[in-house]
A protein has these predicted regions:
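ATP-dependent carboxylate/acyl-activation modules
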Residues: 127-197, 201
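Short, glycine-/Ser/Thr-/acidic-enriched flexible segments
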Residues: 26, 120-123, 145-147, 154-157, ...
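A contiguous active-site-proximal alpha/beta segment in oxidoreductase catalytic domains
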Residues: 1-23
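Conserved phosphate/anionic-ligand binding catalytic regions in large, soluble enzymes, centered on
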Residues: 11-18, 52-56, 154-167
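Short coil/turn connectors at secondary-structure junctions
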Residues: 3-8, 113, 135-136, 144-147
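Short, charged, surface-exposed loops that flank catalytic or proteolytic processing sites
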Residues: 29-32
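Substrate-binding/catalytic subdomain of NAD(P)-dependent oxidoreductase enzymes
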Residues: 23-24, 34-130, 135-137, 156
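A conserved regulatory-domain signal marking ACT and ACT-like small-molecule sensing domains
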Residues: 168-244
Length: 244
């Protein structure tokens, strides 16, 4: 990797979040999935860092610093967790050909880094979509060897212990980053300069109301990628998926 230029890093960096989402895919509610994760030792008694995306955000910030030589992220670094995801969101994503994943990413745009850590829709055909339960994964895109996929168990006592021991050995050895001499120190892009799309679901049993909402959205150039009946309720799905 030392001879490569890094273009982006993206992945699922919190095993607890992925475990909870996997249980919700099997029909559990968010609260039930969180309790199940805690019972199995995959979530802390106070799970806020896991379920609000903070743990994953810390990890992508560290990875960005190692790979891109970037300083600490700015205040407008997008951080969102999974606590507001519902079973309905999971179901709708599945109907549209996606899975819901908590994705953390840092990629270079116009010589600056765009960083975020948030739930996203991932195509079912994507590598990350197939990884369930407590697995973490990272996709590193480079100019010479292309995309590199790394995956491992990301939650639980043994996985955590292995990570801590690895960090201690790394620090004790005084090892430097493999690209410390060749990397460029890059700054961050301002999120206010970026355009993002979102998934919005409109719940209505009134056809006229739903059509009126769709008309307003279309008048503002917000595209509809699908609409239909789910559980006898009219749904509209507004464009948003996270391109891995």
């Amino acid at each position: 990797l030392a001879g490569n230029k890094f273009l982006s890093i993206k992945g699922m960096l919190n095993g607890t979040s992925n475990f909870i989402i996997s249980q919700m895919e099997n029909g559990m509610s968010f609260d039930e999935s969180l309790s199940f994760a805690q019972e199995n030792g995959y979530a802390e008694a106070d799970p806020v860092y896991d379920i609000e995306g903070i743990d994953a955000a810390h990890k992508i910030a560290i990875l960005s610093n190692i790979i891109f030589g970037s300083p600490l992220p700015p205040d407008n670094f997008l951080i969102e967790g999974i606590s507001k995801i519902t079973k309905e969101d999971i179901h709708i994503a599945e109907k549209l050909g996606f899975t819901v994943k908590h994705i953390s990413s840092a990629d270079i745009r116009d010589g600056k880094i765009l960083m975020r850590s948030n739930p996203a829709l991932v195509k079912k055909t994507d590598y990350l979509s197939s990884l369930k339960n407590v697995r973490n994964a990272l996709v590193i895109d480079t100019d010479l060897v292309g995309k590199i996929h790394i995956s491992s168990i990301g939650a639980g006592g043994e996985a955590t212990a292995a990570g801590v021991i690895s960090d201690i050995v790394h620090l004790a050895s005084g090892l430097k980053s493999f690209n410390a001499q060749s990397r460029e120190d890059l700054d961050y892009r301002d999120l206010t300069d970026e355009f993002f799309s979102y998934l919005v679901t409109v719940h209505s049993t009134n056809e006229n109301t739903n059509n009126h909402i769709q008309k307003i959205l279309e008048e503002h150039n917000i595209s509809i990628i699908n609409s239909g009946l789910i559980n006898n309720v009219k749904q509209s799905y507004i464009t948003y998926y996270y391109e891995i």
